[in-house]
């Protein structure tokens, strides 16, 4: 079972369609985005992927073939707290990283 996870930075949230997860916390209380899973603080990518995967019918403990898509223009906004876990999951074969302009 595979899953595409689309991630967007908060600065672009107001001008684009809803995605699976936003990086940042300024829109946490906005009901406009209530259908989106939030991660409010310094987040654990594994937990976020597992929760999204579980929503698609997979198990929280065992997920694979997950494609993480980011906006190319947002890459500079993401610090090591997001890029390092993505790279680690790539090494373990669970995540395929894909730059995207979806």
Functional labels for PLM-detected ranges:
Residues 1-102:
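Acidic (Asp/Glu-rich) sequence patches and key acidic residues
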């Amino acid at each position: 079972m595979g899953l595409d996870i689309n991630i967007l930075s908060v600065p672009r949230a107001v001008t684009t369609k809803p995605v699976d997860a936003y990086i940042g916390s300024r829109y946490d209380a906005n009901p406009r985005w209530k259908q989106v899973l939030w991660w409010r603080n310094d987040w654990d990518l594994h937990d976020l992927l597992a929760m999204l995967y579980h929503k698609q019918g997979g198990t929280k403990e065992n997920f694979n073939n997950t494609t993480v898509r980011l906006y190319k223009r947002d890459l500079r906004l993401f610090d090591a707290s997001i890029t390092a876990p993505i790279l680690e999951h790539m090494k373990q074969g669970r995540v395929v990283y894909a730059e995207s302009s979806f």
